[in-house]
């Protein structure tokens, strides 16, 4: 089995694509989804994001309904930064449980070291560009503006929390998190590098930290 966790709208054939977004369920009732968008409860971005019926709606933190050691490969991109560090540890522990001995987990996430280096370089890029500190805060993505009336903000908040970053990693801290989950981390890799299957379909963001870990045999 190959698991794609937090798949979003990136649905890859041959993988079990899993996402906990309410949009997975709303995509199964298109008329309701369009109605919520018309009254402004959902944004255009929510409306445009579509999920096929074979996407599994599940929360990894609650545990996935698969036996131990049944996954050869697990992939998740830009997921763990949306979790607190204790939650991320539980998330990777669930990945370790699901992996077969010798199975491989690949994680991509924003690279905190790259973000800090860009801030310290202090390059503004023109008089109309954001100040380095403002760009740094924007890149951290720890805040999401929620426009709209009270009901719209209430509903959007339940969608938007998934987009806020809670904890970022550099290569050393991500490797430590992997070890704490019982995995053996490898060195940082490049975009679509590392001998992992279907990266041409799974990996769509070129920037970030790319690392793999194996479950010990």
What are these regions (language model features)?
Residues 47, 87-94, 100, 104-216:
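S-adenosyl-L-methionine-dependent methyltransferase catalytic module, highlighting the catalytic core
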């Amino acid at each position: 089995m190959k698991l794609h966790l937090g798949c979003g709208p990136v649905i890859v054939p041959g993988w079990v694509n899993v996402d906990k977004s309410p949009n997975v369920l709303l995509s199964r009732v298109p008329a309701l989804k369009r109605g919520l968008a018309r009254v402004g409860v959902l944004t255009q971005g929510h409306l445009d994001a579509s999920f096929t019926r074979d996407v599994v709606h599940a929360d990894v933190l609650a545990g996935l309904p698969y036996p131990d050691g049944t996954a050869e490969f697990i992939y998740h991109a830009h997921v763990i930064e949306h979790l607190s560090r204790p939650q991320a540890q539980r998330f990777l522990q669930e990945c370790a449980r699901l992996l077969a001995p010798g199975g491989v987990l690949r994680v991509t996430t924003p690279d905190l070291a790259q973000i800090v280096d860009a801030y310290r370089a202090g390059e503004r890029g023109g008089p109309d560009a954001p100040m380095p500190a403002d760009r740094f805060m924007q890149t951290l993505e720890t805040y999401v503006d929620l426009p709209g009336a009270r009901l719209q903000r209430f509903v959007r908040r339940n969608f938007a929390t998934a987009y806020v970053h809670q904890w970022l990693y550099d290569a050393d801290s991500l490797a430590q998190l992997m070890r704490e989950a019982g995995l053996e981390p490898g060195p940082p890799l490049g975009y679509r590098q590392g001998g992992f299957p279907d990266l041409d379909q799974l990996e769509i963001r070129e920037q970030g930290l790319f690392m793999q870990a194996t479950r010990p045999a």
